[in-house]
Amino acid sequence: MKILITTDLYKPSINGVVTSITNLEKELEKQGHEVRILTVSPDNTSYKEGNVYYVKSMPSHIYPEVRVPFSRAGAMVKELVEWEPDVVHSQCEFFSFGFAKRIVELTGASFVHTYHTLYEQYTEYIPLGKRIGRAALAKWMKVRLKSVDTIIAPTKKVENVLQEYGMLQDIEIIPTGICLDKYRESVLEEEIEKLREELGIEETDRVLLSLGRLGFEKRIDELLYGMKEIVKTEEDVKLLIVGGGPARESLETLVAELELQDSVIFAGMVSPEDVKKYYCLGDVFVCASTSETQGLTYIEAAASGLPLICRKDSCLYGVLEEGGNGHSYQDIYRFAKCVREHIHDDKWLTNAGEHSRKIAEQYGTEMFGKKVAGIYRTVAWKGAVNYESFTICEKSANRI
């Protein structure tokens, strides 16, 4: 099949959406499908690089990394229409979605959309207020996605939200896959020791690992308040925060206010190639976010053999088994209690870590690619049946 993927976010950006798209692209090509990508360029020029079409753009000034195309990309759209894709798979609801919709209208291709982001998590920051903002969002999103044949939800959490919005399309839950081999590989002990030394982590310290983008919606400040409780009795526990983002400065200020300078370490952004080392350095993976839709870091941590202690959220369904490979919490005191009970229990850490690895096996990229390709075949078949039915009805009407 010919598959066109449209997205506002793509390489060189690094985030969960980009990871999902690149993994899908690789798996579809392995299956023999022809894949092309239409995205927003990282600068003000339009260009084509291999199978990727970049539409010139400018900074949005709305949110870091978000750019706005300022071209209708006529030549690129014309070329993609002439290519005649069987399926157009949009990955974002805003700028590139318009291109996707136009190409579907011009080609009759089947239209699939993956809903990656729970925007309602951000409505509390708008003047209208959370309740009114959510209602407006639901109405707008229902209209926006009206032309889509099937929506893919990465988790049950996302499916529930879309159903609350009143979406009428088929909604299929397909967890985003990760490359498990990358996290199965062992890292030399010498490399871990070197990293510990660089970060100022003693050999006897126990490490709580937080890894991901430092956005305000990630609620990392909650982990800091939890650490304030933990260090009252566990002075050898360190919180290692890996990643960069707009919340870093305020988090560093909070660390100083809570007098946690000796217990919290900011590693900054790290290259994708080095991420595995940080997972190996951690003893427990921690997360306070309730804005996740894919939970890729949960799966990466589990595949690396780490137990999970995370704020309770429906995104964790199937990834965190309470008491098996970790615990969920609903306040900082429960978080601190879970850490205190397990951080020095080597037997629990080992058993929970092994359980995490077993759970992660179901989230490989190969299975992800097969499930998505199955959706493509289904919507393409339905489209063909509907087209045939329409043609028959049209011919009958003409005879009359």
Predicted regions and their residues:
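Nucleotide-activated donor-binding/catalytic signature segment of Leloir-type glycosyltransferases, i.e.
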Residues: S250-V270
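Conserved acidic donor-binding segment of nucleotide-sugar-dependent glycosyltransferases
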Residues: E322-Y333, E341-K347
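Short hydrophobic beta-strand element within catalytic cores of glycosyltransferases
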Residues: P307-C310
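Aromatic "clamp/platform" in nucleotide-sugar-dependent glycosyltransferases that forms part
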Residues: T290
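Short alpha-helical donor nucleotide-sugar binding micro-motif in glycosyltransferases
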Residues: R144-L145, M269-V270, K277-G282
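Donor nucleotide-sugar binding/catalytic pocket of nucleotide-sugar-dependent glycosyltransferases
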Residues: T39, Y53-K56, R134, K139-I192
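Conserved donor-binding/catalytic core segment of Leloir-type glycosyltransferases
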Residues: R196, E202-K218, L224-M227
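N-terminal subdomain of nucleotide-sugar transferases
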Residues: M1-Y54, M367, A373, R377, ...
